[in-house]
Amino acid sequence: MSQFIHQLFDLQGKTALITGGSSGLGEDIALALGLAGAEVAIAARREGPLLDTAARLIAQGIKATSFVANLSDLEQAKDLSKRVLSQLGQVDILVNAAGINLREPYGEVSPQSWQEQLNVQLAAPFFMTQALAPQMQARKWGRIINIASLQSYRAFANSAPYGAAKGGVVQLTRAIAQEWSKFGITCNAIGPGFFPTALTAPVFNNPDLVKMHAEKTAIGRNGEMKDIHGLAIFLSSDASAYITGQTIMLDGGYTAI
């Protein structure tokens, strides 16, 4: 039984690239995949936090490498793919976890702000996939995980660009699946509920909002960082080989009731 489970979920010999991997859900996904046996490469804008996170992963016995990239600049997204392949040789698992929500009132959103948020959340995953899927195809195996959101399905105030991008992520996930799954590459999205990350600090800094959102779940609590570990490993492993094009809401039932 243990060998059977090990074979289903073992990621040894795989290399995973996690964008937005220096903090939040990206860091915890990198931790989970690394502990499952994958070599991990993490990418983010700020070198200091990126190096700190890499050190934490290495201290856990994980083989980790860091790459600085600002994915609001799509040329940097393309360059990141080239640098990772040049240094590590291959990418088997791509996790598009970089995110930004500037939380501006609708009437104050500039074209630059709109474009920055769509580039990070929607365009970068598209072009990272475009760059990395062909070398997955050559091995007839690959996993692509996008990060959706509650805002993929419902609107929140002062977050129109973020919500528009996250809605697009759901359809992009289907489009990637349609294009690449016949080559052994699956693409799925994780839709987190409220987790204590930098993006949700305005909620978690307000006890009333924390309580309100917890009460909107079927489980009765908000997400804990460890809650993403199992799903991330599952979608990265052979266990999920017949699942593609899906968005799985990791929200404690927030969108179910």
Outline where the language-model segments fall.
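Short, small/polar-rich loop/turn modules that mediate ligand/substrate recognition or access, typified
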Residues: 95, 181, 186, 243-245
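Residue(s) in the substrate-gating loop at a strand-loop-helix junction
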Residues: 149
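Substrate-binding pocket helix/loop in short-chain dehydrogenase/reductase
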Residues: 105-106, 110-118, 144, 209, ...
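Conserved glycine-rich cofactor-binding loop
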Residues: 15, 22-23
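Alpha-helical segment proximal to the catalytic Tyr-Lys
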Residues: 134, 178-182, 241
